[in-house]
Amino acid sequence: MLLFLARLMAWLPLSWLQTAGRLIGLAAYRYPSRYQRRLRRHTRWAGYDDPAFVRRAAAETGAMMAEIPKIWWRTEQCLAKVVSDQEPIVQAALAEGRGVLYLTPHLGCFEITARHLTRYGPLTVMFRPARQAILQPLVESSRDMHNLHAVPANRHGVREFVRALRRGEAVGMLPDQVPGEGEGIWLPFFGEYALTMTLAARLALQTRVAVILTAGERLPRGRGWRMHYLRLPEPLPETVEATAIAINQAMETLIRRFPEQYLWGYNRYKQPDEAPPHPDEAEPAPADTGPAAAGAPTPPAPPGAATHHER
């Protein structure tokens, strides 16, 4: 039944879906909840204190959810609405023939991003199974696409990633997901410590491929999406930690291009039970890494700043 409804939604105009999604997103935000508190807290930590900004962010989250069925089952129609003036960044990286690691944060429409990138050649992406079993048929049916190969987020998937990169192909992943047990370190993200995955940094250092951050900005009135690309400067830092910091900094730069479309309600700063110890509460919080996509570790903020983390 859920699959039928989702397929039915795919036939509605994109502008209708996004408008309905924005209304639902605003309604969900107005209800006092953990989500509302988290959304306000995360936007404030990043320097966005304006209540109107938070409401726009909540609305864009709803639009992101509502447009997914159309992207999954009316893919070609949606791809025709993708525009970009930054395609030479991708073309230059692919021309080097050493593979490309695409990093797509929870920004804009990350569902359209992967599908657009298949226009350049085979793309292997990593996924996590849906937590709700009822959603699994929807997720599985959405992965059937030419040039798009999905692998699970486990050791098998990592091996598939390495093989694809060594063939000179492209792989893609979400770099701002909270990592699993033993796969993350605490690093600055918008001036606060966040448990940061090391997989992207390890892959980049192991394979020496081009690293490009990418996101699809949602355009108004259902006009489609604008693709953004940001290539990580080379040579990369020599250590996994420094490279992961550089990735976080580049993500901040990309997010600040259209910050209201970042998924601020995602529990990015949580501390899983199996996570390494959070930095001492007495230590100063890391400074906001700002817009620079550099590879050097960020210096700490002045003493007295507060450090935050969530469960």
Segments and roles (model prediction):
Residues 10-15, 61-63, 84-86, 109-113, ...:
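Short hydrophobic/aromatic-rich motifs at helix boundaries and adjacent loops
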Residues 96-155, 181-185, 218, 222:
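Catalytic core of membrane glycerolipid acyltransferases/transacylases, capturing the structured
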Residues 87-91, 114-115, 136-140, 161-162, ...:
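Short amphipathic alpha-helical segments and helix-helix/interface helices
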Residues 36-38, 129-133, 193-197:
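Active-site metal-coordination segments of metallo-dependent hydrolases
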Residues 1-104, 138-140, 145-147, 298, ...:
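Membrane-anchoring hydrophobic helices of lipid-metabolizing enzymes
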Residues 76-82, 128, 147-153, 189-191, ...:
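Short, flexible loop segments at the rims of nucleotide/cofactor-binding pockets, characterized by
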Residues 22-24, 28-31, 46-58, 94-95, ...:
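Non-catalytic C-terminal accessory region of glycerolipid acyltransferases
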